[in-house]
A protein has these predicted regions:
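Phosphate-coordination loops involved in phosphoryl transfer and adenosine-cofactor binding
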Residues: 51-57, 194-196, 313
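Adenosine-phosphate binding glycine-rich loop
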Residues: 313-361
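Glycine/threonine-rich flexible loop motifs
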Residues: 135-148, 207-211, 280-300
Length: 361
């Protein structure tokens, strides 16, 4: 698809988010989201340069990463900056964020020292930390309830003592960089996405996956004022507070938000179908039972050619990595509806746009 912007005659306004943190796209106004999309598209089209020369990003990955790490490092390098990625517990100390903790266990450095020291050596910090990504929800649940993990304590404690902007590279609750990349892809493909139909569909998966990415993919359409449908089986609703915030924002933008388990109605004439598996919050901490109870959903809750045909010319999105013929069939993933490669590439351009906007002016 062409990288040119919707309105190429109007140069993108320079974004200035200097000094701001980015934990979710709710930290941004809808106008700021659109500004970042315009900036990303202008960077992709070669219409502007990110102001990153001499800038340094520290990237702290508690969890594995492919697209996020490469997109952030590439964004910095392409525009004259640099990125330093570290993995706590592997090539750094283990970190502690609790207050008043007697550190006689396996943590060696407290966030009170860590955050100011790191942030005096760089211009922004990106952090990926989720107890639910790597070990899975079952083991993650052993570290606390969903409500406790959704507080993203380490991220917020780091922000408290940081002296430069902090970017969330995925937490237990949010993944804003994925959200911005998805929004950019939607605007590229649809032009004017307002009031167009977006479907976020749950899919079967052998594991109970975290909700951070579907929460943020939901916001990718909400921030564009689309008519949004969350398609999921009974018992697989997203976090109620996230749904409340999403509904409040999308209605203010003239769009709508509904939930349904009616796949026939949801797929019909959809402009965008975004697939993602996630675990049931109703089953949180009871994952073996969830696996048993959701087994009958396996064959029906997959994105296939027949379902995508109901959309007409709808596009298919997935954050990747994806399990072929579990979440989506080969025919869809490799076919005319699929935009997943553009979506993944846009992680680069949105990362560059975010760092450009956050850079000290």
């Amino acid at each position: 698809m062409p990288a040119s912007r919707t309105n190429p005659d109007r140069p993108p306004e320079p974004m200035n988010l200097s000094g701001r943190n980015l934990i979710s796209t709710l930290d941004l106004s809808p106008e700021e989201v659109r500004g970042l999309i315009d900036s990303a598209r202008a960077l992709k089209a070669g219409e502007k340069e990110a102001r990153l020369a001499g800038r340094v990003a520290a990237l702290v990955f508690f969890n594995p990463s492919v697209r996020t790490r490469i997109s952030c490092e590439s964004a910095m390098a392409r525009y004259g900056g640099s990125a330093i990625a570290v993995q706590p517990g592997k090539d750094t100390w283990n970190f502690e964020c609790g207050e008043g903790v007697v550190m006689d266990g396996n943590t060696q450095e407290h966030v009170r020292e860590l955050a100011p020291v790191i942030t005096r050596m760089c211009h922004f910090v990106g952090i990926r930390k989720s107890e639910l990504i790597t070990v899975g929800s079952a083991q993650g649940a052993a570290t606390g309830s969903y409500d406790e993990l959704a507080k993203d304590e380490f991220l917020h404690r780091f922000m408290e003592f940081a002296e430069v902007p902090v970017v969330n590279l995925e937490s237990n609750r949010w993944h804003p960089m994925q959200s911005l990349a998805d929004s950019t892809t939607i605007v590229e493909r649809l032009g004017k996405p307002e009031k167009k139909k977006y479907v976020l569909t749950w899919t079967w998966h052998p594991k109970s996956l975290p909700v951070a990415t579907p929460h943020s993919q939901l916001m990718s359409a909400v921030n564009l004022g689309m008519d949004v449908t969350v398609l999921r089986p009974e018992g697989y609703g997203l976090e109620p507070e996230v749904m409340r915030l999403a509904r409040e924002r999308v209605e203010a933008l003239g769009g709508s938000l509904q939930e349904t388990d009616d796949q026939e109605a949801a797929y019909k004439d959809a402009d965008v179908v975004c697939a993602k598996a996630w675990g049931s919050l109703d089953y949180y901490g009871r994952f073996e039972q969830e696996a048993i109870d959701k087994a009958p959903l396996r064959d029906d809750w997959i994105v296939d050619e027949e379902k995508m045909a109901k959309t007409g010319d709808g596009i298919f999105l997935h954050c990747l990595p994806v399990r072929r013929n579990i979440v989506v069939t080969d025919g869809v993933l490799d076919g005319r509806h699929s935009a997943v490669k553009d979506e993944a590439e846009n992680r680069l351009w949105t990362a560059a746009a975010v760092f450009d906007a956050l850079a000290p002016k």
